[in-house]
């Protein structure tokens, strides 16, 4: 069975992404009307049902009461911040957070008997839902080169095997070290130290596929790639724009903050191609009015924008603000802020006003309407809201970041905020809403293929070595390097690289070309089924579990989406006696690797010395000197033999001590962790209206709206999550807010578009993406569903549709896959009515 194919001019189609039991799973697919509100009693019911099924009653109560509490553990789900400790509820988690906890704290186990029963081919034919549902991984497993099954392996043997492969590489750049956003600060820090001590900056991470565009745009405009608001700022805003984001599914606890905005008199505008339930009304299950009442209407205005039209929208808003300033000088534009703190304003104004006529950034009113799908009156209404607001926050997520023009779009929304001085004052600013719980912290710890010189200088000074300076590989470039034979060893610290990445056929072939792939994981996923010639699964502790090392119980830390750092302490007994923490795994692997490199060095020196004995005394002296030089240069690999990896793995406070001397803002790290709720990292634009850009000022930028041509008979597709899903983890087969139950292979299309294409509602179709080089990619057997999405646009779930995303389809400057703007056509599925 096949769920996707890719072909080019030659017409050759390659099978990818085995569908396994997908057709069986989708046999119960049912479609109903989308919901008009989110959460409420059903949310509580679904959370409890999942928890009780996976964990049982006592375990559920014991675990859920500790989620996001000051002395508990950080939810392994999203990165939305917690309220101050005194303001937290007893149930400071959402429905999807409860699902994430249940997935990790499940009583089910994946044992050696499971792997003996299921071959790799069998596993590769299963769905992500089935794989994740098997339970927790409990012992290291090894797939010998080209073997059909995994077999048990000891930790020492696993470390030795990996170390041997790494030591045998011709260059450290033949290895790549991927990081998932669940990884703690402590694990991320030693992981990047290990990679750089080895001699490479190949540190791709999940941020490359999501908010890399945000970091790139914000660094170039305000000097720091993080959001500028706190939770208190958001809740004090007069106007909040929620753009390209579905908080009800992806960040449900954000809804409580949006409710506070409304109850304080603020206004909310939602900008999105889909009318998501949570953008319309929220029934807060923490309050009686949310359970038995109607809840709170959230969006005062809903702009159903066309995919990719956001840049044109923000330019149109900028033009309207400038025109309003002309009509009433000194009442709209914050000239004092602009003069004191910004650069590029005059160029921005010239670009937006163009020739002085009614055009905006070179676009006519008709072109703006075509790009956005909005009327001039709708844009006027939003501009009016901005004119009357004193404090504006713009929130966004993947709906902005995964387009070819994503970086320019985010720069443009910064332009609009700068016009009114809405950066660096209370209740105003930028709010990129991060996904995985510590994805922002991992970047702070140095998980980045393009580290700054300042970070490398500090790291080198702390550990006494010269870190590599050449930039490494991000996710897309790692796939290319594996495909081309330039990366031979892949190590994944959490996550599900194979399922999360674009162009499934290319990615899976690239992974299979590796000599060794290593996955550090809690549960089974597709990256354990599609592997290199040899593969290892290293099972790790989850957030919910107690981490006890030789120095005693440990705590780890995370950084939320607003730059707050706090501790996380699991309490449950580990799922298996052989589980090791991520920190212990990294430190054990580093110890074994540098020992292997030292042996290699010694062997090289011995060989040189043996050759010298057969030569003249003078030649022998020269050869011995050469051998000594070899001994000194082979571990140019960092000269980190002096790092006490064992000690770091046994006491995480020692890691935090190193972090405090390397990473700005972590002074007195250990002491400040004791503060209730943790501590905030410095953010110059927010804290003091200072901007660490080359000019020392915030930058207005000039951006051109990208032209995206959609041929007749085609649609623009965005890939989305279901409500029973977190990233690539599939908890169930329902997406109840959108009225989809019992299956995932659906494509949501506007009824007018279905009629124009001659496709009846309920028809089974293949999705065929069309790339600029003429190649096509196919995802088979999706049910077309009539749905009120923006006209000309469609939506379908990932990872099933990742096969449609060309590897070369990336955002300019950030190299993020453009999963929100794929040109597709619908073709009838063979053999299905």
Positions of the model-derived regions?
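Cofactor-pocket helix-loop regions in the catalytic cores of large enzyme subunits
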Residues: 15-45, 135-437, 459-605, 610, ...
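Short Cys/His-rich Zn2+-coordinating modules
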Residues: 52-62
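Short, flexible, mixed-charge glycine/proline-rich loop motifs
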Residues: 63-69
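Short cysteine-rich clusters marking metal-coordination/redox-active sites
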Residues: 72-78
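Short, non-ligating residues that shape and space the ligands of small metal-coordination modules
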Residues: 84-85
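Low-complexity, highly charged intrinsically disordered N-terminal segments
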Residues: 102-149
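Low-complexity tandem-repeat tracts in intrinsically disordered regions
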Residues: 608, 613, 617-618, 622
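Long, compositionally biased stretches
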Residues: 672-813, 819-821, 826-833
């Amino acid at each position: 069975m096949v769920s996707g194919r890719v072909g080019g001019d030659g017409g050759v189609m390659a099978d990818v992404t085995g569908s396994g039991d997908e057709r069986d799973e989708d046999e119960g697919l049912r479609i109903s009307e989308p919901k008009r509100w989110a959460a409420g009693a059903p949310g509580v019911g679904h959370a409890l049902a999942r928890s009780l099924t996976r964990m049982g009653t006592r375990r559920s109560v014991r675990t859920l009461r500790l989620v996001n509490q000051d002395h508990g553990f950080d939810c392994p789900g999203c990165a939305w911040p917690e309220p101050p400790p005194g303001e937290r509820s007893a149930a400071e988690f959402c429905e999807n957070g409860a699902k994430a906890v249940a997935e990790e704290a499940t009583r089910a186990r994946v044992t050696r008997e499971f792997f003996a029963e299921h071959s790799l081919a069998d596993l590769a034919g299963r769905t992500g839902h089935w794989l994740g549902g098997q339970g927790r991984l409990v012992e290291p497993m090894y797939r010998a080169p080209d073997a059909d099954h995994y077999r048990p392996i000891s930790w020492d043997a696993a470390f030795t095997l990996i170390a041997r492969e790494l030591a045998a590489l011709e260059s450290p750049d033949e290895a790549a070290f991927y990081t998932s956003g669940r990884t703690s600060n402590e694990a991320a820090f030693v992981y990047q130290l290990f990679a750089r001590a080895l001699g490479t900056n190949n540190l791709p991470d999940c941020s490359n596929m999501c908010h890399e565009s945000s970091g790139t745009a914000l660094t170039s405009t305000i000097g720091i790639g993080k959001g500028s608001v706190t939770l208190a700022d958001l809740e004090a805003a007069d106007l909040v724009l929620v753009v390209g984001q579905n908080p009800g599914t992806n960040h449900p606890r954000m809804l409580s903050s949006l409710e506070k905005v409304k109850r304080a008199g603020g206004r909310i505008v939602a900008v999105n191609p889909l009318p998501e339930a949570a953008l319309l009304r929220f029934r807060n299950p923490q309050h009686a009015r949310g359970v038995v009442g109607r809840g709170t209407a959230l969006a005062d205005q809903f702009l159903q924008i066309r995919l990719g039209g956001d840049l044109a929208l923000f330019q149109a808003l900028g033009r309207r603000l400038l025109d309003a300033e002309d009509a009433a000088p000194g009442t709209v534009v914050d000239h004092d802020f602009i003069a004191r703190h910004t650069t590029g304003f005059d160029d921005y104004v010239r670009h937006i006003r163009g020739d002085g006529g009614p055009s905006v950034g070179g676009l006519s009113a008709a072109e703006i309407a075509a790009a956005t799908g909005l009327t001039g009156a709708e844009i006027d209404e939003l501009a009016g809201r901005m004119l009357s607001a004193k404090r504006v926050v713009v929130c966004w997520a993947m709906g902005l970041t995964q387009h070819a023009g994503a970086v320019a779009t985010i720069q443009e929304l910064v332009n609009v905020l700068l016009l009114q001085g809405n950066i660096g004052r209370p209740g105003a600013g930028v709010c990129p809403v991060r996904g995985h719980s510590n994805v922002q912290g991992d970047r702070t710890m140095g998980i980045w293929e393009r580290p700054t010189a300042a970070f490398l200088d500090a790291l080198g000074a702390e550990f006494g070595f010269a870190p590599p300076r050449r930039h490494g590989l991000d996710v897309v470039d790692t796939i290319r390097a594996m495909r081309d034979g330039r990366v031979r060893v892949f190590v994944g610290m959490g996550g599900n690289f194979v399922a999360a990445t674009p162009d499934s056929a290319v990615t899976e072939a690239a992974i299979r070309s590796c000599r060794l792939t290593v996955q550090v994981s809690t549960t089974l996923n597709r990256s354990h089924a599609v592997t290199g010639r040899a593969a290892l699964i290293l099972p790790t502790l989850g957030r919910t579990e107690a981490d006890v090392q030789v120095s005693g119980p440990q705590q780890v830390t995370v950084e939320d989406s607003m730059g707050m750092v706090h501790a996380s302490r699991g309490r449950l007994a580990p799922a298996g006696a052989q589980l090791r923490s991520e920190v212990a795994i990294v430190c054990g692997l580093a110890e074994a690797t540098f020992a292997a490199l030292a042996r290699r060095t010694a062997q090289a020196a011995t060989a040189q010395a043996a050759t010298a004995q057969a030569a003249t005394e003078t030649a022998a002296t020269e050869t011995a000197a050469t051998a000594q030089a070899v001994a000194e240069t082979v571990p140019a690999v960092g000269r980190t033999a002096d790092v006490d990896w064992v000690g770091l793995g046994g006491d995480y406070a020692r890691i935090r001590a190193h972090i405090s001397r390397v990473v700005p803002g972590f002074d007195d790290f250990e002491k400040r962790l004791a503060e209730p709720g943790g501590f905030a990292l410095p953010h110059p634009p927010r804290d003091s209206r200072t901007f660490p850009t080359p000019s020392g000022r915030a930058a207005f930028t000039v951006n051109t709206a990208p032209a995206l041509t959609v041929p007749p008979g085609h649609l623009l597709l965005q890939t989305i999550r279901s409500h029973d899903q977190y990233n690539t983890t599939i908890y169930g087969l329902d997406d109840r807010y959108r009225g989809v139950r019992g299956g995932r292979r659906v494509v949501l299309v506007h009824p007018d578009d279905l009629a124009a294409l001659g496709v009846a509602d309920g028809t089974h179709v293949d999705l065929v993406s069309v790339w600029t080089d003429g190649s096509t990619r196919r995802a088979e057997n999706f049910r077309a569903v009539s749905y009120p999405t923006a006209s000309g646009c469609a939506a379908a779930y990932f990872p099933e549709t990742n096969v449609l995303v060309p590897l070369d389809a990336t955002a300019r400057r950030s190299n993020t896959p453009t999963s929100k703007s794929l040109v597709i056509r619908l073709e009838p599925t063979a053999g299905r009515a």
